[in-house]
Amino acid sequence: SYGGVFSRLEKLGINIKGIPVEDDGMNINLLSECLEDLKAINIVPRYIYTIPTIQNPTGTIMSKEKRIKLIELAKKYDAPIFEDDCYADLIWGEERPPSIRALDDSKRVIYCGSFSKSIAPGFRLGYLVADWPILSRVLPYKTDAGTGGLEQMVLSEFCENHFFDHL
């Protein structure tokens, strides 16, 4: 996973528990065991972080079945899912699986995407999609990597008129 995420979470005092990745994504059985262990000591995870599509560094893609099971576990243990899907636009030659957020009807997925991988690395722009109760709590932690206003306006214009053609 992206190292910047871990350093940021550690600065916020969040404990991180890693779950191994299999050929078709996160090991859901081990995740279930971990969540059950946490529940036994009255700990509710702040969220479950995953890169389901082109996971870094393995390049694995979580199967649709595992995405659905992940949502079921998140519901069972009342844990939001942070879906880091910044590499999803890099899929070539095969069908892109639906995002976890698209499969979720409980509104517990925070979806993170990036224009840096799909349009231009120099832009260093990303975005979050979440319902307002979640997004309002996340906004105070946003950072700016120095992307200028002009670049943001150019990207906005591009997305408004041409983004779907680009994909």
Where does each model-flagged region fall?
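Substrate-binding/gating loop at the entrance of the active-site cleft, primarily
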Residues: 1-14
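Helix C-cap/helix->beta junction micro-motif
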Residues: 12, 76-77, 107
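Short beta-strand->loop structural element characteristic of the AMP-binding/adenylate-forming
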Residues: 15-23
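Hydrophobic residues in well-ordered beta-strands that form the structural core
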Residues: 18, 81-83, 155
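Active-site phosphate-binding strand-loop segment of PLP-dependent enzymes
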Residues: 26-92
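Catalytic cores of nucleotide-enabled group-transfer and carboxylate-activating enzymes in metabolic
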Residues: 98-99
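PLP-dependent aminotransferase class I/II
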Residues: 110-167
